[in-house]
C-alpha cells in the first residue's frame, strides 16, 4: 500500500509583483531574491518542497519576512501559489473549484491566527458554535458541541462570558476551541501565542501539547520563537528569504545545522532541550542494580534531569511498550548539562 502524505508541497513558489510569472518562467526556477527585488517583485516562497505525515506537527519558523506565513497561506490556498503543486490528502488544490475549496476548508481544515478575531457581541459558547451553524448544524446541536469544546480547552464556567471579559490567553483558547469544533483533520496555526505574555504563552503551549496528545491532528504551526518550536515540533523547517534552509527533527537542526544561517539560529540552544534519553543511555546490564524511578527513551533530557540526578542508582529506560531498553546514568546527564551533548 503506497504512502499518501496529508500535505505535500512540490516546488512551490509565491512571488508578488506584476511580472512575477514571466520572470519565474525565464529564470527556470532559479530564483535570486535580489534580482527579483530589483525588478519590482518580492519573493515570498522560493521552491518549497516537503511533506507532512498524518498526525505530524511541522513547525515553520524564521525571522519576520522569511516567508513562513506566506507559505502557510499557500498551503491553505488563502493565497494562490505562483507556481508548483500543493496536495491535501492527494487532492491538487489548484484543480479545485471555489465551491470544492470552501467545502475542503469547512470539513478538513482548522485555522488559528495571532489575532483572536472573536465576535465581540457573542459569548464564548456562541463564538465556538458559530462555524457549526454556518455549516448548517441545528442550533441545539451546535451549542452542545460547542460546550464539549469549552470543556476540552478548560473554559467550563466561562461559556457565557463575552470576549472583553476574558484574558488574552482565555480568548486564544476560545479561538482554538472554535477551530476544533468542526473536527478538522488538518490544523493551521500562524503565531497563535506570540501576542501573549511569556507565562501565558507557556501555559498555552502546555495546553496545545495536551490537546495534540489527545486529538493527533496534522499540524502546520508558524512561529518566530525557536524555544517554542523546540517544545512543540516533530520536525522544524527554518526559512530565510522564502527558502527552506533546513527541514529536520529538532535534535538534528540543533546538532547538525545544514547551513551557516541555521547554525547561527541554533548556536545558543542548550543541548538538553533537544537531546532525548535514548541518545545518551547505556545498554541494559542485567547485573546492574537500577532505581525504581523510570524514564521513557523519547523523553527530552531537560524534562527528567532533576529527577535523575536525585537518584543514587542508574535509571531504567523504557520504550513505548514499557519494556526496559537501557539504563541512564547521572554522569551522562551531567555531561549534557555542563560538558557538551555527550551523544553515543
Q: Can you describe what each PLM-predicted range is?
A:
Residues 76:
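Helix-to-loop junction immediately C-terminal to a conserved catalytic motif
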Residues 247-248, 256, 327:
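ABC ATPase "signature
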Residues 290-320, 327-344:
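The conserved cystathionine-beta-synthase
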Residues 181-185:
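A short, proline-enriched helix->beta-strand linker immediately N-terminal to the Walker B motif
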Residues 8, 25-34, 91-92, 133, ...:
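Conserved ABC ATPase "signature" region
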Residues 162-166, 170:
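Conserved ABC ATPase signature
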Residues 84-92:
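Conserved ABC transporter NBD signature motif
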